[in-house]
Amino acid sequence: AKRIVERGENNMKTKTTAKVLGAALLTMTLARTATVYAEEEYTIGIEQFAEHGSLDNCREGFLEGLKEEGIEEGKNLSVEYKNAAADMGTCGQISDGFAADKVDLMVGIATPSAQSLYNAAMDAGIPVIYTAVTDPLAAELADDEGNPVGEITGTSDKLPVKQQLEMIRQMLPEAETIGIMYTTSEANSEAAVKEYEELAGEYDFKIETAGIATTADIPLAAQSLLEKVDCMTNLTDNTVVSSLPTILEMANEKKIPVFGSEIEQVKLGCLAAEGLDYIELGKQTGKMAAQVLKGEKKASELPFETIEEASLYVNTAAAEKLEIEIPEEMTETAAEVFEEITEA
């Protein structure tokens, strides 16, 4: 009996030792795996179509979104950032440069940049993530069901047109005609104009438009448009928004209010906007990019995403300059009220 007990004890000791060694080996393996993962480094190329607040916020939010997923500039992320200064030729040069550099991921901020990057990335086999693309279908970056047309996906900043029209009607009960300036080569802008024209009648508005090709066209187009309208509303049109101070100066001289499409435009002096938070949009995009970089998903497996909820922003300083009284209920329910105009 004594011999059996000893043998059992030895067996127990052997099993215990094996468990300890196994646990140690597993710990070492996990640690080694974690070290390898931590040492994974990425290089991305970010192309931003133009320099203005909403697109800057997208870029800021994008990097924050990556950081929240463990991918941080200066640690395991190298960023090549280029601004196209609203020039399509420059877009192509930047895109080709990223392809030649064989970056791990291309990021397009605004529609022209997204389209340009995708054209360069198709042959290079590099995935593309975009943000601030109002209509991915019109831009031919997604199919009719919202699925990617290739290794490209991202987030849309589709305008809340109904909410904007409701807000304008509430703020300007006597207004009849809304003016919209847009870039004729931007598919997103054309789609947004069409939606405004389709919905305007529901709120007893008419839409008057002015198409432009470059920023050089804006002063003359604005002058003509301001003669025909009671107010203007902006799209997320990059060429127009980059010249917003010029438009506001001309409109203010005629006491014609200009409504924005997001928070940064309201800060600059637009009367109000039903708009998106572009930092949050950027964060959402960064999290999508992290999935692609880590190999968890292919870009082609991720349908584009949107932020559904719009927020009201108003500028009381702009209202005072225009001699317009903003309804109290609007200032009370606004996500943010600005009491001064920020210099561009």
Write out the residue ranges for each language-model feature.
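Short hydrophobic alpha-helices and adjacent helix-cap/hinge residues
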Residues: 8, 38-344
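Compositionally biased, low-complexity repeat tracts
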Residues: 4-5, 18, 41
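Short, Lys/Arg-enriched N-terminal segments with co-localized hydrophobic residues
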Residues: 1-11
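Sec-dependent N-terminal signal peptides of Gram-positive bacterial secreted proteins and lipoproteins
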Residues: 15-37
